[in-house]
Amino acid sequence: MRNYPLKAVCAVLMLGLSACSSLPTSGPTDSAVLEINQGADASELAAKVNVIELNESLVQQIYAAQQSQRFSGFADVRGNGGYAGAVNVGDVLEISIWEAPPAVLFGTTFSSEGQGSGHVTQLPSQIVNKNGTVTVPFVGNISVAGKTPEAIQAQIVASLSRKANQPQAVVKIANNNSSDVTVIRQGSAVRMPLTANDERVLDAVAAIGGSTGNIEDVTVQLTRGNQVKTLAFETLIADPKQNIVLRAGDVVSLLNTPYKFTGLGAVGNNQQLRFSSSGITLAEAIGKMGGLIDTRSDPRGVFVFRYMPFAQLDSKAQQEWAAKGYGNGMEVPTVYHANLLQPETMFLLQRFPIQDKDIVYVSNAPLSEFQKFLRIIFSITSPVTSTTNTIRSY
């Protein structure tokens, strides 16, 4: 009879041990994450997770890719300077021709106004056609595409010199339709003609009336040919080198996209947190989450979960993941691992950038899980021990 309570305690302990796997926890352990794509029982998604250790080479590579988004890195295939003042297809030209008296060609043919001792004739406005030409009376079609107004003036005078009396010409671009920039903002879009003033990115932002959103949430996207770069509005304002001269055909877009990441695990705050479009580092993200909880966290198990666009992988990685069924337009599930027990990792945290929709997870320490188990065991065995003592007292 006296062994019965002891057997009951042992039975409760065995029951507690069998329930170890059911202990409440905030997420997987560090070993579970690191071995996610290993083992025969790995799910189809888990088998395709890319687990990457944080190291100096990787951080430098990611940092360089982030710097490549700066507008100052645009390749300028047109040489220095912006708008060159050249006429092109679609432009509207106004041509005025002077002829000294006595006027030979332009005396009565067109409506004109006297001006001093000369005679000026204003030709009807003309749109440069697809062939790049306009028509001038007594000259015919002349090629103007790619030429400046001054060059066209000289061309007209040379063509009329043997027909008119001391001709002079003035060519003006009335509407610059071929050299403009498209500026887009939510609910609004404008076309900004380029001039010899060399308009820059911030001029385009001003042309559309600036941003309507919080400056911390706004990014500026510049599309030039096949290149697309996105930069935080704050960075564009703070760094004059990014306020580059615009080119004909550029598209400037103001995007109001609040950036967020989610903090989970053994950290001070398990929640979704916003950050500026200028970005934050992993070190700053951990600080925003309230840091690691001393009594729970495993500093060896700091992870960043992210979907990485296939196109952003290097050529070697693309070949590896293409063999697993990935291709352009797809995203590779990626986990970055940092071990904070290694002092050099602290420097890497200050360069590793957090991206929109990232999950930053800190695993629980093994000792923390064991302490949970002990609390459960003691909460179960205490009433049994009390009962045993009561029975023995009889």
UniProtKB/Swiss-Prot annotation:
It comes from the Bacteria. It is a multi-pass membrane protein. InterPro entries: Poly_export, Poly_export_N, SLBB_dom. A lipid is attached at residue 20 (N-palmitoyl cysteine). GO terms for biological process: monoatomic ion transport. One of its GO terms (molecular function) is polysaccharide transmembrane transporter activity. Keywords: Capsule biogenesis/degradation, Cell outer membrane, Ion transport, Lipoprotein, Membrane, Palmitate, Polysaccharide transport, Porin, Signal, Sugar transport, Transmembrane, Transmembrane beta strand, Transport. GO terms for cellular component: cell outer membrane; pore complex. Residues 1-19 form the signal peptide. Gene3D superfamilies: Outer membrane lipoprotein wza domain like, wza like domain. A lipid is attached at residue 20 (S-diacylglycerol cysteine). Its main location: membrane. It is found in: Cell outer membrane. It holds the Pfam family Poly_export. May form an ATP-driven capsule polysaccharide export apparatus, in association with the BexA, BexB and BexC proteins. May function as a membrane anchor for capsular polysaccharides. Possible porin properties. Belongs to the BexD/CtrA/VexA family. This is Capsule polysaccharide export protein BexD. It comes from Haemophilus influenzae.
